Amino acid sequence: DLRANDLKRSQEIVESKSQRLDAGILDLEKRKFLVDQKEEYLIKLLEDVSGLTKYQAKELLIKQIKNKSEKELISILKNAELQAHSKAKIISNNILILAMERIKVELTSQRTTNIVKLPSDDLKGRIIGKDGRNMKTFEQIGGVDIVVDETPNVVVVSSFNPIRREIATRTLEQLIIDGRIQPVKIENELKKQEQELEYIIQETGLNTIKELNINDIDIELVKLIGKLKFRTSYGQNVLAHSIEVAKLSGAIASELGLDVEKAIRAGLLHDIGKAIDFEKQGSHVVLGAEIARKYNEDPIIINSIESHHEDKEKSSEIAAIVAIADSISASRPGARYNAIDEFILRMHEIEKIGNSIPGVAKTYALQSGRQIRLIVDPLVASDLDLALILEKMKEQIKNKVIIPGEITITVIREKKETDILK
């Protein structure tokens, strides 16, 4: 009986709890219903106020969040880009500083005169010669001016063409040592010194490629490199500039982990066209690319030559490095002087005009272009042609070249007969 009473009591407790649970569930359902109604009412109210449905409001909210996120992302990216640019600038500056510290820069400016020292002022009369014949021989055969003034124990060899000036200077120095100064001796010595200078040009080229550790290069290209020693541009010696660009290019390439040997070679050859641009028509860029192709240089070298003045698009990192190195070398203080180069361009133009006239073998622009000598080929032009050649030269000079003051043009036709009596 006691067990039956306990069981009955337990059943009553369970039923009581079950009833309370059912009542609670019912109450929750009523509350949920009221909340749902309230939610629908509020949504309807918001839709009426905003003019948006629930789904439209949801889309608008998502869009606003997306726009905000995009703005934040753009801001982050801009900051990262600025930091990257700043870091890249610091790195690039460090590379250039390291590259420039690793090379020795020499300031080499242009001259249009050489000074020849004399052991005695008495030699000046012998240099001038009877009726100025010796000086005229230097002008007509050598294409230079010999300036004799009151300055003690010196004479000046003047010419815008550095190769002619060097040949004439060496000739005069040798004649002073020899003691015999006369037209025939001057002419022979000029020819001899021209041959010797060709050897010096080749040796200069060989020493240059040795200094830069450049191999497998055609000997004719080596000679052109040596010829740059006697070429100037904007007052800057072209060989010195090319060596500087080569060293800078190699140093920058080394810092960037690129082909150092190719960068040095491209830097050295970037202005190779200037070895012949006073002899052939065309820009030094076009002529340089032609030279590089002729001697089977690498396409990267050719493109570096073609693109260093932005004439063509750069196809490699090496080409970009050469252009940068060229700008550094050309822009440093004291590297270039425009006025002298403009003068030289005028002198070249005068000689090109003269040489373009039929019958003219050689043209020399002397005394800053105020004296022009036209040497006529006696086998092509007769004495009767001299006046016509003179008129053609005068007309073209008037139209193409501006030279202040008076210009004296002299046309020379000379025929020599030489024989050996045995």
From Swiss-Prot:
Any single biological process term in GO: mRNA catabolic process
Highest taxon in the source lineage: Bacteria
Disulfide bonds: none
Keyword RNA-binding: yes
SMART domains the record matches: HDc, KH
Domain spans labelled KH: 112-172
Molecular function terms, GO-annotated: endonuclease activity; RNA binding
Signal sequence extent: none
Alphabetically ordered keywords of this record: Endonuclease, Hydrolase, Nuclease, RNA-binding
Coiled coil: none
Location of the HD domain: 238-331
Pfam family name, one: HD
GO cellular component assignments: membrane
InterPro entries referenced in this protein's UniProt entry, alphabetically: Diverse_Catalytic_Enzymes, HD/PDEase_dom, HD_domain, HDIG_dom, KH_dom, KH_dom_type_1, KH_dom_type_1_sf, Ribonuclease_Y
EC assignment: 3.1.-.-
Function, as annotated: Endoribonuclease that initiates mRNA decay.
Family, per entry: Belongs to the RNase Y family.
Identification of the protein by name: Ribonuclease Y
Species for this entry: Mycoplasma mycoides
Gene name of the record: rny
